[in-house]
Swiss-Prot record:
UniProt name for this protein: 1-deoxy-D-xylulose 5-phosphate reductoisomerase
Keywords carried by this UniProt record: Isoprene biosynthesis, Manganese, Metal-binding, NADP, Oxidoreductase
Key word Ribosomal protein present: no
InterPro entries: DXP_reductoisomerase, DXP_reductoisomerase_C, DXP_reductoisomerase_N, DXPR_C, DXPR_C_sf, NAD(P)-bd_dom_sf
Binding positions for Mn(2+) per the UniProt entry: 153, 155, 229
Record organism: Pseudomonas aeruginosa (strain UCBPP-PA14)
Binding site for NADPH: 13-16, 127, 129, 213
GO-annotated biological processes: isopentenyl diphosphate biosynthetic process, methylerythritol 4-phosphate pathway involved in terpenoid biosynthetic process
Positions that bind 1-deoxy-D-xylulose 5-phosphate: 128, 154-155, 184, 207, 220, 225-226, 229
Recorded metabolic or biological pathway in which this protein acts: Isoprenoid biosynthesis; isopentenyl diphosphate biosynthesis via DXP pathway; isopentenyl diphosphate from 1-deoxy-D-xylulose 5-phosphate: step 1/6
Upper taxonomic lineage: Bacteria, Pseudomonadati, Pseudomonadota, Gammaproteobacteria, Pseudomonadales
Pfam families: DXP_redisom_C, DXP_reductoisom, DXPR_C
Amino acid sequence: MSRPQRISVLGATGSIGLSTLDVVQRHPDRYEAFALTGFSRLAELEALCLRHRPVYAVVPEQAAAIALQGSLAAAGIRTRVLFGEQALCEVASAPEVDMVMAAIVGAAGLPSTLAAVEAGKRVLLANKEALVMSGALFMQAVKRSGAVLLPIDSEHNAIFQSLPRNYADGLERVGVRRILLTASGGPFRETPLEQLASVTPEQACAHPNWSMGRKISVDSASMMNKGLELIEACWLFDAQPSQVEVVIHPQSVIHSMVDYVDGSVIAQLGNPDMRTPISYAMAWPERIDSGVSPLDMFAVGRLDFQRPDEQRFPCLRLASQAAETGGSAPAMLNAANEVAVAAFLERRIRFSDIAVIIEDVLNREAVTAVESLDQVLAADRRARSVAGQWLTRHAG
């Protein structure tokens, strides 16, 4: 290798970004940070810039950029600080960049992720909303540009590892019967149904196995996360919703499975640590040390599986329906969920209201065809508006 590969980490201060930079730091001969971006944790971004000395840093606003530029200059760091969405797209698509970690949470990450794809980069996709919102457009851009798209979600990474290399020829053609998408069931898997309305944001964010941000923790608690992953799996692996089955697996040791027509089931197992799928995607088709401890099968002891309870997890049903409907439905589902989760974290609504808001939006808004990014973003805006109207009527 003549030089280290340059990586832009979009969402560097989040859990995925920090895990990515941990892998970068373990392999300075292989990787170096080209650009780091942050949204609200600007002190953390400054610390990361001091440690990794990227060429660029990106923040949301000009005032923050001026402040960070001054701090870094005073420390003798020559990182150039940019601001705004256009800057995100620029560092995602810059000619010097070899790979992009797309880890900005939610719809906000779509434009920069798409910019990386259109520039033909190796894209490490942690932003599931990009595929949920604009699946057909996104995958068309991948094929058109020749980008290498590698999934970072532990489940999709596990599926990728468990499929044959020629899966793009068609799942049935390569002998796949179905994809088994595992889910921990979150912190409320066994909570009495009558208590779900009164659970707190703190309880929802206390995931039993994974360390995650607040939004994705709530999505895991409602199993909307798994619903979004079902939609993502359909686009990544050219599967029909009927070919993807969600299985609750409380230990989070099996990260997903592929069931073949000959009766074989191939699975990927490992400790629940995002550095495993991140390092796999960074080094693919090679493998490198991720810093993750080996899996102790004797300590695991047993593996349990359950069917999801639709009464307990209505968000999973809504996501499955959106996947079947297609068009703008997944984008509206995602937008309504983002609004509802934010309101729950602000204690404006109950946990059980999240699914109510999403269903209200899907019932009120007509599904349209999606043929451009503008149409995707328009559907997103409409859904957010309808969800906001629900909050105005019902929330504090």
